[in-house]
Amino acid sequence: MEKREELYRGKAKSVYKTDDANRLILLFRNDTSAFDGKRIEQLDRKGMVNNKFNAFIMQKLEAAGIPTQFDKLLGDNECLVKKLDMIPVECVVRNYAAGSLVKRLGVEEGLKLNPYTFELFLKDDAKGDPFINESHVVAFGWGTAEQLARMKELSLKVNDVLSKLFDDAGLLLVDFKLEFGVFHDGSIVLGDEFSPDGCRLWDKDTKKKMDKDRFRQGLGDVIEAYEEVANRLGVPL
């Protein structure tokens, strides 16, 4: 597989074309951002940890019948993925109250949600990734009703699979965000990544935060927490 020019550079990953029109290379960088990119720092080992963590999770999801963008690892910081036409909507599943939900509704952090909640946000840093609903997605042409239904179905299946996986490792899956895209055959596929950058994970007993909130809130030991989560899951680093 030949790596070609950079196609897109995000806050923490770069995307490269390849000699296969249906495949891309994702490069996980050490860049760590918060507050819609207003704060960016370099954290040693982060790109490697997130790349291998993502590979592990995506393979678990594939084994559970969830179609993902991931093809294979290419090295410590790179993986090969399917090229998708990304839908500019983030799907957020919440099992416990945290983050923007606490700010919006004034509820107590850590409140168990029964049942879980499913939310949509427009992927637009300049607008602060605003909270939207399903009718917005269809009305503005960001996706179809059928695509949304499939995205929700897959998001909830991801929640079922990963809640158990993390629970077995002594962790609470507090919430997470997912992004989806359309493959060349028209199917909806889970894209982007799944890592401690895009979810909240707490130790079941101590409620210690083991995710990117350690960076957002200045708690320190960010990568050490990521590595502990990986080790508990058995991710080969």
Curated annotation (Swiss-Prot):
Gene Ontology biological process terms in this record: 'de novo' IMP biosynthetic process; cobalamin biosynthetic process
Biological or metabolic pathway of the protein: Purine metabolism; IMP biosynthesis via de novo pathway; 5-amino-1-(5-phospho-D-ribosyl)imidazole-4-carboxamide from 5-amino-1-(5-phospho-D-ribosyl)imidazole-4-carboxylate: step 1/2
Gene3D superfamilies cross-referenced by the UniProt entry: ATP-grasp fold, B domain, Phosphorylase Kinase, domain 1
Pfam families, A to Z: SAICAR_synt
InterPro entries reported in the protein's UniProt record: SAICAR_synt/ADE2_N, SAICAR_synt_PurC, SAICAR_synth, SAICAR_synthetase, SAICAR_synthetase_CS
Sorted UniProt keywords: ATP-binding, Ligase, Nucleotide-binding, Purine biosynthesis
CDD domains from the UniProt entry: SAICAR_synt_PurC (cd01415)
Catalytic activity, as annotated: 5-amino-1-(5-phospho-D-ribosyl)imidazole-4-carboxylate + L-aspartate + ATP = (2S)-2-[5-amino-1-(5-phospho-beta-D-ribosyl)imidazole-4-carboxamido]succinate + ADP + phosphate + 2 H(+)
Any one annotated GO CC term: cytosol
Cleaved signal peptide residues: none
Domain of life: Bacteria
Enzyme nomenclature, EC number: 6.3.2.6
Entry's Gene Ontology molecular function annotations: ATP binding; phosphoribosylaminoimidazolesuccinocarboxamide synthase activity
Family according to the record: Belongs to the SAICAR synthetase family.
NCBIfam families, per database record: purC (TIGR00081)
Protein's name in the database: Phosphoribosylaminoimidazole-succinocarboxamide synthase
Species for this entry: Pseudomonas fluorescens (strain SBW25)
Taxon lineage: Bacteria, Pseudomonadati, Pseudomonadota, Gammaproteobacteria, Pseudomonadales
